Amino acid sequence: MAVQKSRKSRSRRDMRRSHHHMEVAELSIDATTGEKHRRHHMTKDGFYRGRQLFKASQED
């Protein structure tokens, strides 16, 4: 079984974890509706790249 020779310091542990952060999702603005949405995802209204793929559900 693999066992480390000596304990890793807090500094080395934290340096290793420095890349484990969440990235901010890039947002685009839809040309048709002007609504912000995630890149390569459709808007809540059902628009993607200027076309309406799905009709928006009406919740009352």
Curated annotation (Swiss-Prot):
Q: Which NCBIfam families match?
A: rpmF_bact
Protein name in the entry: Large ribosomal subunit protein bL32
Ranges for the region named Disordered are 1-60
Pfam families in alphabetical order: Ribosomal_L32p
Q: In which residue ranges is the amino acid composition biased (Basic residues)? A: 1-20
Can the keyword Ribonucleoprotein be found in this entry's annotation? yes
Alphabetic keyword roster:
Ribonucleoprotein, Ribosomal protein
What GO cellular component entries does it have?
A: large ribosomal subunit
What cystine pairs are annotated? none
GO biological process, any: translation
Which family is it part of? Belongs to the bacterial ribosomal protein bL32 family.
InterPro entries, from UniProt?
Ribosomal_bL32, Ribosomal_bL32_bact, Ribosomal_zn-bd
Q: Out of the domains of life, which is the source?
A: Bacteria
GO function terms (MF aspect): structural constituent of ribosome
